[in-house]
Amino acid sequence: MSEKLLIVEDDKKLNDGIRLALKNDAYFFYQYRTLQEAREILKKEDITLVLLDVNLPDGNGIDFVREIRKNSQVPIILLTVNNMEVDIVTGLEAGANDYITKPFSLMVLRARVSVQLRNKEAAAKNSMELDGFEFYFDKMEFFKDGAVSYT
C-alpha cells in the first residue's frame, strides 16, 4: 500500500513543488491550502505523514499539531519561515516530529520524510492497536484517544 501524505501549504507553487519533489517515491498525496480542509481529510483517511505550514489563512499550524495529537501519533513535519529558536522549540514541544525552515532544500525534505516514515515503521513493529488503544511495548505505555497512560 502506498503511503498517504497530507500536504497543508497555502502557497500553491510550494504545495505543488513538494508533491513533485516526492512523486518518485510512490506516495499518494492529499494537497490542501487550509486547516479546515486538512481536518476533513484526517477524519476520512488514514494519513501516514503530515507536511504542515505554520502560517495558514484559517489558523496556526502549531495549534493544529496540538489538535492532531489529541487523537493521533501520525508523524508531522512543520514547514515555516518562522526560524527563531523559540518558534522551533514551540513547534517541537507541541508535538511535531520535525521542523524545517523555509526556504529549504527539496532533497533534504525528501530525506526527512523518509526518516519519519522509517521511524514510524520501526515503531509499528513495537506497537499494537486494539479497540481504540495503542500499546507501545518498547516504552511500556499506551494511548487512549491520544492521551498517554503509563503502566
Placement of each model-derived feature along the sequence:
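The C-terminal output helix
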Residues: 115-127
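N-terminal/domain-start alpha-helical segments
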Residues: 1-118
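A structure-centric signal for secondary-structure junctions around beta-strands
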Residues: 2, 73, 124-125, 130
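Structural motif
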Residues: 130, 137, 144-145
